[in-house]
Amino acid sequence: MEKNRNRSSLQSDGQRVRDTGAGPKRAISLKDVIALIVGVVIGTGIFKTPSMIAANTGREDLFFLAWLAGGIISLIGALCYAELATAYPHSGGDYHYLTRAFGRRIGFLFVWSRMTVIQPGSIAMLAFVLADYLSTILPLGRSAHFLAAAIPVAFLTALNLMGVQKGTRAQNLLTGIKVVGLFAVVLAGVIIPPSSSPGAPVPPHPGASFGLAMVFVLLTFGGWNEAAYLSAEMYEVRRNMVRALLWGVGIITAVYLLMNLAYWRGLGLEEMGQSEAVAADLMRRILGEGGARFISLLIIVSALGAINASIFTGARTNYAMGRDFSIFSFLGKWQERSNTPMNALLFMGAISLMWVLLGSFARKGFVAMVEYTAPVFWCFFLLAGLSLFVLRIKEPEVSRPFLVPLYPFIPFFFCMTCVYMLRSSVAYVGGGAFVGLAVLAAGAVLLLLKRSPSQEGPG
């Protein structure tokens, strides 16, 4: 009875949006979604994590194997999300899948965590990286550093408020500049001979392990699942979503392999392992300080693209939550003229700026944001993978235009990867995980204080 009521409510909610015309409209193309996937994934990690991965592998074959494995694992995850997103196109993305599979309470806890910790924390993380690299070009004091992190978040939020086309065009432009810049680095590292010989060998990393290397690889690949939040606004979603995910992950894997080939060619694995800024060191070796400044500008553009994509998709989850829970109903309003979830965008921008302010008091804002967000993110990513199994059993009658090949082995492997990453992230961040867990607990308390979610609208 409960399952039927849930399904009926889900259908009636979607019908209500169509009847009133107040809701997402199909305005996002295949190209837009691919640009968003590439933009959100290729943020700042590729400029930092290769040195950590080199230190933890210690051998060229293992180093490149780790990056190839990251691409394969991401492709496996993309296949799972392709089935979910084409069977259940919805602006809530993971929230919608978790609600249908595990009930509204789990759905609420996910969207609460994503709204308050996961997405704004990631945006703040990127903003701190942007400010760090801007400070290598312009001298910034402490207050100016905070403003350098906060202003891009506020500006991109305002840009997205102007309309969905403004947001997607900005994303396409930033992603295009980013990809051109990355290939310039690849050409510099592979074609132009280094100006000096690679650095001397260094002792192996004391805690080196292939498993820890994979943690950093998968962190660098993270974000391709954001495409699911655009399924309600995408043209021909049942056909284009699969293509967007596969093309997006394929492009990202190719770019990462080529970038790391350039790093290895220009610096050697040993010097990579001891570098604090591997891309800057490579370009400085080839082009001097001008090359290092070029990398700083490229990282700033890359961070801007990832921030814009995160604001764009994060607001869609907030909108879905506002549609389904009366306490957040102010988030569930869609602005017809701009075709945007205006209140949800404003809320996402405000919470992100709050995390920027909070992180500015921490010793290292970027590290603090990783600690606050990583364990909660991997916990719900695991549940999203499990929802594929649950929904195949609970709702076999739902049309699935795309089915994961080699079921159940591929989704099982994806879930086991999430388990490993959850365990590793908890071990890596230590006490910082309690901040994210405290916010999750606050959501649970809020859920208990309000009326039963079975009386609310669905997710």
Where are these regions (language model features)?
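Membrane-interface "cap" regions at the ends of multi-pass membrane proteins
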Residues: 1-51, 55-60, 74-79, 90-91, ...
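Helix-loop-helix connectors at the membrane interface of multi-pass transporters/channels
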Residues: 2-3, 7-12, 17, 95-107, ...
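Helix-loop-helix junctions that connect adjacent transmembrane segments
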Residues: 19-24, 60, 64, 141-147, ...
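Transmembrane helix-loop boundary segments of multi-pass membrane transporters
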Residues: 54-59, 129-145, 165-174, 294, ...
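TM-loop-TM module centered on a large, flexible mid-protein loop between adjacent transmembrane helices
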Residues: 96-97, 103, 135-140, 246-311, ...
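A generic transmembrane alpha-helix motif of multi-pass inner-membrane proteins
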Residues: 372-377, 389, 406-459
